[in-house]
Amino acid sequence: LAAGGTLGILIPPSIGLVLYGLIVGESIGRLFLAGFIPGVILAITFMLMIGIASKIWPGIAPKEEMVTWRLRFAGLVSLLPIGLLIFAVLGSIYFGIATPTEAAAAGVTGALFLTLAGNSGMLAISLVAGLVRRFPLLPRAVKTVLDDFRSARPVLPGQVRHNVNSMVNILKESFLSTARTSAMILLILMAAFTLQFAFAAVRISVDMAEWVAAFELTQLQLILVLVVFYLVLGTFMESYSMMLTTLPILIPVLNDANVDKVWFGIIMVILLEAAQISPPQGMALYVLQGARRDTDRELAEYEGVLANTGTINDVFMGVMPFMLCMFVVIGLVIAFPELAIWLPDQAKGGR
């Protein structure tokens, strides 16, 4: 859970890539495209690690009951509107139809519509079911599943008022959450640009670039040094703070070394992921430990026994194999830069 939760800052849409692009002046669309293939590879390595570990130690992943294909298909149908919305938002950016800001506005509007429709008796599912039933070639099982969705929630007394109150609460929480996130991003950007201006005014960035150039490092050597630097920094510093305080200094260094900033951005975001699960300061580790404690306490109360939650050291040890997966993917991206830059070059043209 801790490692999988970090995938969100690599697989688009990603706040981490947006912040990186704004700080270094890189195209958000190119960064989103660049993060797709490494993100999928990282997710696959996580799945392989889980599969191998569960074969070696079967007790860590007990087998669940088999789920019928009918239920699997029902789950896919319920995800169809969300999937189409994600495809529309990212696709409009990738194909140059809309800017990231325009696509974000369209995505918010679509998500709001789906949320309100879902709280109004699953209107979206009913519409999909009505359209699909017009095609006689579909299997009867498909139509049956969709009919089940339409009749799953009959209207009960007081349900309309409850749905209206629920919608109002959803809108309220959405607006507050958006305001908090937007304020956080704007404060980070304000601090980053202020720091960048201050470093430029006192020539710290220029002096740093000249100091690094004096070592006559190759591009590969420079990247490896930066990887080690960020791995060490991530053990005692929060990930976004790490990016905020170092990028303004590194931009001239990367420019002098002719480093592709899209390629380096993907490497850096994976390093930010590693920082989130790096002992002893990884934020995701403490979130997971808190969730473990709450879950164990609720389970113990249900069974009438004392809770026996493991220590944070168990979480530290548990994430080590997944950090190894991140190191493998970083190595692949360094060895094969095309993993990050091929897709944006194909979609938007090389530079």
Feature annotation, model-predicted:
Residues L1-R351:
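Alpha-helical transmembrane segments of multi-pass membrane transport proteins
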